[in-house]
Amino acid sequence: MIMLSNGMESRVGTVGAKWEFFHEWKRLTEMDHGNIELPTMLRGICKKENLIDLIENFILFDHSGGTTVKILARNHQYLGVNQAVEMYRHRDVMKGKLGVFWHTQGSGKSYSMVFLAQKIRRKFEGSPTIVVLTDRDELNKQISDTFENCGLLGGLKAKQFIAQSGDDLREKLMGNPSFVFSLIQKFNKADAEPIRPDHDIIVMSDEAHRTQNRIGFTGTPLLRDDNITARTFGQYVSIYDFKRAVEDKATVPLYYENRGEKLQELKNPKINEEIAARLDEEELTPSQQAKLEREFAQEVHLLTAEKRLRVVAHDFVRHYSDVWTSGKAMVVSFNKVTCVRMYNYVQEYWQKEIEEIRKKTEKDASQQEVQELKRKLKWMEETEMAVVVSQEQNEIQTFKKWHLDITPHREKMEKRELDKEFKDADNRLRVVFVCAMWLTGFDVKTLSCLYIDKPMKAHTLMQTIARANRVAEGKTNGLVIDYIGIVKALRQALADYT
């Protein structure tokens, strides 16, 4: 652990960490406004019990990605986790409700869950079982991998701790495992005999559900009418909101640009509140998706028309090739078929842009201009793109109706670890096309440009734009590009969730 200060400003980090990951320690309690001067850091870190606590419970070694990174808790994580620990200490008084842990997306919520689990299992008798709940397979894998890579699973593979079925979950809970990772859907036997363990079970719910001793982790706050979550988990145990995270440089600011309204040839459907809410529904089955598209056939037709998609694809190529040094990009489309169509159109315009740049290098230009064009040309030629969508039954036939072939995309998704490639700053996979996957709980620090061409609102919109707010070396901000017209929904979401 290294502390750096000139007296007026102070930061703390770990040996070998880049400057972007040295952070301020400017609060002694969550209520403090914040003071970046040295005395605050000295009182917060160097006080004997705090220093011992930090060294013992708030340092991790993350072995993901083939390298080992030393992680020191940030100020907000240290304060929030310790408040949650105190709630657990008084769990009988709290009737098992440990509260809602609201730390905004991108501020290290997964690490906070690891810190909390680590400290409780070290400092309290009885070795409580910690059950981590999510509602998607990809999130379940991500959080279990985080626990494994940070060494909390005793050198064992995360797969051994994942409940594969409702029966497997029940069998695991009847034992005394250190950890269980499960989808909430696995609790599917409401009439089964209750399990009565002789030890504590702590349920950490990523976006909140009902259990024994329980704490709900969330990246967005409870809305005023969300009484179920409050009744289940209790009130907030820790708050670290969107604005404070940006002020503390725990996340980078997000800049918004409405490019859709600048494109005169772009014909957008009129999306009212009802349509936006329905189109925004997550994880629809193929039959539900088909029913939805029939119900709003006119709007969907306009949204997915070839002429419109080509306008968006062409503008994406022009824009992203202009900001090519900024980082990686994610394109969010309406559905799986549209993702593949957008991929094809972008490939077409990408190659045309490459040809245009080649022609420019052959024209009269200064040596400096030619060198810059050649650098850009090399980058564009090397850049790889991928479609990332979940698999469904009869998908080959579904795509054939649109004269599309999903097979090469599916093979790429199955044979390669696209998530790891996209997270690797040096990997040539720089653009992904998604509609639902990777929009929540997927942390890519070098993702800087998010292109939205799908109606979204509220919680889903906030989760999505947060993909671009992670801190990375040389990254000053994330950019949200709007083609569909989400500005009203974005204002409402920011009002509700920040």
Predicted regions, residues:
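Interdomain helical connector at the RecA1-RecA2 junction of SF1/SF2 helicase-like NTPases
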Residues: 226-328, 342-365
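Conserved RecA-like ASCE ATPase "motif II neighborhood" in helicase/translocase motors
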Residues: 177-211, 413-418, 434-436
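Conserved helicase ATPase motor motifs in RecA-like P-loop NTPase domains
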Residues: 105, 209-225, 249
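A short beta-strand element within the Helicase C-terminal
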Residues: 433-434, 438-455, 461-463, 478-482
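Inter-Walker segment of RecA-like/P-loop motor cores
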Residues: 151-193
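Conserved helix-turn-beta segment of the N-terminal RecA-like "Helicase ATP-binding" lobe
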Residues: 137-164, 348-354
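ATP-dependent helicase/translocase motor core
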Residues: 1-129, 138-154, 175-179, 185, ...
